[in-house]
């Protein structure tokens, strides 16, 4: 991975396995990371594991609060944002046959 030293990055869906791996790689590349997800205990585990990341609990399905979340996350990262890794996923229905 390229050098990301000093880059401010938000990772959504960070409390799951894929999010954990993304954060690990970004951390190795030197990025400043804010991890978000719905399970605060998992986010706190990430903070303990990597030490230098910031965490912010957020449920991406609250679409009316996304702008506020990004503003708060950007402030936590020092006022600038370089990238958002949209790893969080939501689904409205669990039957693939009904999804289009």
What are these regions (language model features)?
Residues 1-7:
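Flexible N-terminal pre-Rossmann segment of NAD(P)-dependent oxidoreductases
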Residues 12, 81-88:
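Rossmann-fold scaffold of SDR-type NAD(P)-dependent oxidoreductases
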Residues 26:
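Aromatic pocket-lining residues of Rossmann-like dinucleotide-binding sites
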Residues 58-69:
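The beta1-alpha1 cofactor-binding region of Rossmann-like NAD(H)/NADP(H)-dependent oxidoreductases
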Residues 67, 91-100:
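Conserved mid-core segment of classical short-chain dehydrogenase/reductases
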């Amino acid at each position: 991975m390229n050098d990301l030293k000093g880059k401010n990055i938000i990772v959504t869906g960070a409390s799951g396995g894929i999010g954990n791996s993304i954060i690990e790689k970004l951390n190795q590349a030197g990025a400043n990371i804010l991890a978000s997800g719905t399970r605060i205990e998992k986010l706190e585990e990430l903070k303990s594991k990597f030490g230098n990341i910031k965490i912010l609990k957020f449920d991406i399905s609250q679409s009316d609060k996304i702008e506020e979340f990004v503003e708060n996350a950007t402030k936590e990262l020092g006022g600038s944002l370089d990238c958002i890794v949209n790893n969080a996923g939501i689904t409205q229905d669990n039957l693939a046959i009904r999804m289009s």
